[in-house]
């Protein structure tokens, strides 16, 4: 099989993702590289030092959050890491996702695929990674002021989102987005969208979408239109904050 080397590929886009992703597995996989693991650990230390005046308050919002991040990074294998309830807390997931993206861009750079050779796009929280990673991290991440500042901000942002406890995220799958009676926060595909809000708001979305689906399916049963029934699936995305909430 003939594979083109990365540096020979042109017009490439790299997507940095956000919440409701397998960020724990990704971060753990990067941590199995001893060089990257050490860099991540030192970067976390530097970011914690940066927020030293408020670090105690931040750590009290989600006790054990920092320990969980260190546990993921120190895992011998990504298979050793299983999702835990604390992972849904933005205080853990927001810095965890950014740290994983820093590691990913570094590994691409080690292959000769540096940031100037591709266009980076951020989905959701991924915009933070795009802004942070306009160039390849240096030899010592803890001395890179830009990296330290962004990771420190991620810790503060995540803690603030966890403290606010203003909702969750729910996906709606199987329904053409044009049939949705309430505008979603994010559209992932023609038949998948994400809503954010508190429990009452998401329950209202479920009722409205279910009613719209029932009405649509009824028109098929009465032969007012052709086609197949629409089957809707609702799923909690395991994110304890209403990202994309308006």
What are these regions (language model features)?
Residues 2-177:
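FabD-like malonyl-/acyl-CoA
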Residues 133-246:
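Alpha/beta catalytic cores of group-transfer enzymes, especially the acyltransferase/condensing modules
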